[in-house]
């Protein structure tokens, strides 16, 4: 399978841009920086990452696996943000 159909630009990242990369890079560079949700909730990137991992583990325990489709009945909440990262981190969509 040919994967280099378009020539890479010099500015291109040398790795795939994945949603989990947004969280993992912030965790690596500023683990104690806070994520603030509407002045109601505050989590450091470290704490938030742990929450995301717990949600991913809970979904896996419920039988969700790589490639499964997950519906999220929420929006604009701290729970939605956790699901936004947890679902693709475990390979589901």
Residue ranges and their predicted role:
Residues 1-17:
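Flexible, non-catalytic linker and terminal segments flanking ANL/adenylate-forming cores
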Residues 2-3, 19, 32, 78:
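Generic secondary-structure boundary/loop-capping signal
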Residues 6-7, 19-24, 41, 59-60:
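Short, flexible segments with low predicted structural confidence
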Residues 14-35, 50:
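A short N-terminal helical cap/helix-turn-helix that marks the beginning
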Residues 33-85:
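Conserved AMP-binding/adenylate-forming core of the ANL superfamily
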Residues 88:
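Anion (oxyanion) recognition and catalysis
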Residues 91:
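Structured binding elements
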């Amino acid at each position: 399978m040919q994967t280099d159909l378009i020539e890479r630009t010099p500015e291109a990242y040398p790795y795939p841009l994945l949603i989990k990369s947004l969280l993992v890079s912030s965790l690596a560079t500023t683990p104690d920086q806070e994520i603030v949700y509407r002045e109601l909730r505050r989590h450091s990137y470290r704490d938030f990452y742990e929450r995301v991992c717990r949600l991913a583990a809970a979904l896996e325990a419920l039988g969700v696996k790589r490639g499964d489709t997950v519906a999220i009945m929420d929006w604009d909440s701290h729970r939605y943000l956790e699901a936004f990262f947890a679902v693709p981190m475990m390979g589901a969509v």
